């Protein structure tokens, strides 16, 4: 060994041994003094300040959107929006309203996005695919709680069309007709078997919990055909199911402003997420539930394949999830991750907004005795023998006052308040004298469309009569609870079906009487734009007592 290494080299190597290290480190070089470190930190700070200054100058004066009106602070930074949506819990929509009041029908609401408040332009922006391709705003996709890959969170127009195609048959009018008996059955179980069983007990019932349970069971039946009503049959209508969506909605603005949090949750165990933050844990548990349902669909597919090979009957009906895993989508579109996120979107979007509208409608019907009496009288023509004889959806849709009540409820509950930003990827958009560059996110909100005084006089009043008699083209144009165009709400027909059956059963002649308990307008009137509209966050819900 010594023959290969001279003494000086052996001494140097020995100096690396732990026992020798303390005496062989050289002294700290002079250039690493505290003064120099402070200067280095100052230089880094100066570079960062120059970068921020340059970014602000670009956004205010050089950006393609610099020509559009709006507050300078909104053009400079997205933190202006984040402040109102995170600190004030979904209040930016009201700031946008003030911007339009001050600056006009088109405003720049953040460094990258425009908002338009002009009812006549809606049909120009939200178009079908044969007119113009429409992409989704990338920042929205990144912030919608790990739904990337689902049809809802797909940016590309063409890819969205491919992903949505297998879903459309289930939620078409014809598809909902096939599901009608199931919805009618679950309606009877909720209203007759559960709610009316509380008659004379004095028990306070939260209708928002009951309706969330109902909508959850409906969409679960569609997706995986669960044999039992997991939520409706729960003693208190599975309040955790409601709380999961409520907490999730409250957290959405934070995730949209800081999408990196989603990636953190993605790799975090559900138990740890729950410990750190209740809403984070809710998302993790919801994801696990959707994964289980997707695996159930895959097991059904395996049983189907086995039964076909053995000439046995195929087990069960073809559920939506089973249809997805058995579809002719390319392999990349059938990955576990993407299908799991699709499942989360279908179950989540099929539950919360419809249930919220049911509670909203019940409140306004109950506080208006004339509306309640007129609705009950009209329902008598098809509900006299209920539940022994159930009306069809088509029969309910022929009742003009029932349809007017539903339309007015959807108008005032908005469907969603949030602006649905759309992107024209290759063509510029024209709005009055403005040319909007391709690739610019542009949004419009049902909150503005549904409150247009020219179209809907006395817009904040619940007036079903406005939908009777002559309905003007402007009313049809402005009525957008499910949006329009190539990306309109997939579950529109299902929502109408559920609303018809629930209201018919709740307010039919001879139904067990129920009254509001400790509930006022603040418990239903939307005041927070959390993607879905929500009333005051400390509300105790729509509570009733069956007399």
From Swiss-Prot:
Q: Which reaction does it catalyse?
A: ophiobolin F + 4 reduced [NADPH--hemoprotein reductase] + 4 O2 = ophiobolin C + 4 oxidized [NADPH--hemoprotein reductase] + 6 H2O + 4 H(+)
Single Gene Ontology MF annotation = heme binding
> What does the similarity note say?
Belongs to the cytochrome P450 family.
Gene field? oblB
Q: Where are the transmembrane segments?
A: 42-62, 242-262, 345-365
Cellular component terms (Gene Ontology): membrane
List the subcellular locations.
Membrane
Report residues carrying sugar chains: 277
Tell me which EC number(s) this protein carries: 1.-.-.-
Protein's name according to its UniProt entry: Cytochrome P450 monooxygenase oblB
Pathway(s) the chain acts in: Secondary metabolite biosynthesis; terpenoid biosynthesis
The role this protein plays is:
Cytochrome P450 monooxygenase; part of the gene cluster that mediates the biosynthesis of the sesterterpenes ophiobolins, fungal phytotoxins with potential anti-cancer activities. The first step of the pathway is performed by the sesterterpene synthase oblA that possesses both prenyl transferase and terpene cyclase activity, converting isopentenyl diphosphate and dimethylallyl diphosphate into geranylfarnesyl diphosphate (GFPP) and further converting GFPP into ophiobolin F, respectively. Other sesterterpenoids (C(25) terpenoids) are found as minor products of oblA.
Q: Where does heme bind?
A: 489
Q: Tell me what topology the record assigns in the membrane.
A: Multi-pass membrane protein
